[in-house]
Each structure stands twice: as C-alpha cells, then as structure tokens.
Amino acid sequence: RVPVPLPLAACWQRRVLGYQAAIITQRIEKAQPIAQYIEKIPPESVAIVVKQMHDAGVWHADLNVFNLLIDAQQQIYVIDFDRARRFDVVDSKHRQNNLLRLRRSLIKVRGEIGQQWYEQFRRAYLQLAKA
C-alpha cells in the first residue's frame, strides 16, 4: 500500500484532445515537502515508500522533493500523480527514470547535501530491491 492523501472527490471533463481531470484529497496536517528536511529524514524511510509505489505498479511522472511530503509523525506521503502510469510491473528502466528524476530535484534544490542524501537513498532502495 502506497501512503497517499485520502481522495475525497474527483471529476473529469472531455476535451477535444483528451480530457481534463481534477481530484480533491484530504489535507495532511502539518505535512511539508521533504526538500526542507532531508538532513532530518532517514533516506531509508523514503526509499521504502518509493519502493512500495513501484512494487504496486505505479510509475510517477514527476517524482521530486516537492511531491514527497513528511508529516509531524515522520510519515512519508507521495502526491501529484498527474501523468503517472500504472503497470503490471514497473520495469527497471522506469524505476531508474524515477530515481534519476528525484536525484535531479535533490541536487537542484539542496546542492551537495541533496547529492549525498540521494546516494544514501539509492543504496537503501537497491538493498530493498535485493530483499
């Protein structure tokens, strides 16, 4: 099970070239993007959530430090599944794509600290993949 905000309502409207959709989710009290707190967040806890998402067959189109939230209880949540895709199995290419997108985001927002944190996250993710 992937930790996400509880969906409350959704709608969609047909357009000439596709559709437009919206979803309203429950607010997660005191949740903040992980970008501001990576020094305090164990990379392993984020690796577990990202691995759960991939194991559930979900590929996130924009996995970045603003689409991973942490609440006051240190629970990690994934948000913004716009353009996400569902697969029977998320293959290694798509998994790697997600990890590299997160890496770019970490480096852009947090520089060297982001790079160091990502390396720990990646090691944890790969360890989980072996288990």
Regions found by a protein language model. Give the residues of each.
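Conserved alphaE helix
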Residues: 41-52
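Conserved ATP-binding subdomain of kinase catalytic cores across diverse folds
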Residues: 1-32, 51-56
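C-lobe/activation-segment region of protein kinase-like
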Residues: 71, 76-131
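Short, glycine/acidic-enriched loop or turn micro-motifs at the edges of active sites
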Residues: 29, 65, 83
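Hydrophobic residue at the +6 position relative to the catalytic HRD Asp in the kinase catalytic loop
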Residues: 63-70
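Glycine-rich, phosphate-binding/catalytic loops in enzymes
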Residues: 3, 42, 94-97
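AlphaC helix of the protein kinase catalytic domain
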Residues: 31-39
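Conserved catalytic-loop position in the HRD/HxD motif
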Residues: 57, 62, 80
